[in-house]
């Protein structure tokens, strides 16, 4: 009898399999017939059968996945008698809270478990889930919150929105399936706006997924809240007028696209619910509740919105009266940062420093930068791509050669105007060429500003560029471009970076590049991060005016003959995942009370009275700490100032970027009257700043010691 039962089940399986294959064949034939008379090719237009082969490949892959899932199911039905019994779908992983997207495709259910303790604490949860299972289609609002008929979506909604179920019954999971992410990156206008981003994500995916797996082993990655996140890339929209999409493969600026690529990878791998758009017209469709200014913020279908300044402007125009209630949800990608003085619209107007980029009146921490140059903003960063591992880099034979940092001819020309010596870069490079062969990677055919002795390779792909860097001993900075990713790539490949020093510092008054940018930063070198946080022996910051110093530096590098790869943890995939996870879990810009900030914790903060004329940024750095603007509020009073062994002649309140502070001439104690102007970077010759300084993890500046989660 058991054998007959087995034969019957095998017969059913074969019959079901043949039926699926037959139906699949009919579907493919119908699709082919429907599109058979259409024009094919990449320029055939929008409503054509372009690349039917790719479509078929996707369909076939989907069929195979479905067949495999059916085999797993039938294997259970037939008591495991099938030969290809490759997995036990009833087995439970110890880390059940982390479900892979591919597992969901294979039919393994997401772990959303109600324990007995949960049921006791939330007695209405089960009955509400039952109601949801019957009624979730009764109103479209449930689907807008992500309810899709699954138990997990019910629990997520009932915990996050209505509070009837425990949040711990589900946790943010990591997703490792690349195909699912690629489905989010399809340009509805067929402009291939995401093309470069898709290529970078795909190329780096194995490293990203490995980093996510390593990080998931830490306790602080469990029980994370899952967020609904809208990502709008304003710079890629047609309305931006910047033509980023059109120029992404023509030598155009890629720094912003690097950051967007890595942010999208990070958010996806951390398991959040993503909506991605580059269409200005689609904004309202993703924010239906934003039309009215009086609706509750809780009714919005998103928790966080990532965009750029262009996108922020588009949001303001599109949603008009509804903007105010969700402005606190914004996180703005802002490469060079926005300082409080420029962000505060009225203050900027009064002081005649208002720019087209500034005056947003957001909290300064809502601006996310590429490098940690201003503690008032949040450091998002990016990932330095690595084509070779450290052992490969160390084993590569280095040649007596150097590579110049400058992929466009105009970059070599710009460097002429950064220094006072008349013969410019040629005199500087002439010194170096006496010791090493000089190579370049300059695009195009016209190289008017490139010295004849430079061996130019043109624009190289990533693998070839990293190979060239790993074979070279020195990476030569010309002074421009400012703060790019290339020096970090060179250092990661073991090359020593010569970082041009600026005397006097570059700023928005003496450099056309910074004119109009909402910052008064003083760039002391081409790459301040490399100068301040990496330094020797990987980075030598020298004045290109001083040719003797240049010569001695090159000799020192070659004599030491040590070329070890180095990459700060914060610029690795794992480092970015850790940092962004901490931000997402702890940063809340929609709390408007004056309570002491819980994150970073108060235990990580040291109050320091700076010398007159020095900013809190510099005061904290000298103590090997970072200025922490979240903790200015508890220092903004007379008691906190007098704790520094000072006696106030009188107390006054004022609105400027220098306070809280002590005036060394008048003995006055001055507190901040406008919290939006609390600033790490303000300084005044007569004032001693009272500074909240925090510890930081070397190689992970955004996080304090002990607050990695």
What are these regions (language model features)?
Residues 595-614:
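Extracellular disulfide-stabilized recognition modules
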Residues 247-256, 368-470:
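Conserved catalytic-core segment of nucleotide-activated headgroup transferases in glycan assembly
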Residues 676-709:
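Short, structured beta-strand segments at or near domain termini in extracellular proteins/domains
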Residues 473-579:
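Catalytic binding pocket for nucleotide-activated donors in carbohydrate/polymer assembly enzymes
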Residues 608-678:
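Folded, disulfide-stabilized extracellular/luminal domains of secretory-pathway proteins
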Residues 294-423:
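Catalytic core of nucleotide-activated saccharide and alditol-phosphate transferases
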Residues 7-20, 24-27, 32, 36, ...:
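N-terminal pre-catalytic "stem/leader" segment of glycosyltransferase-like enzymes
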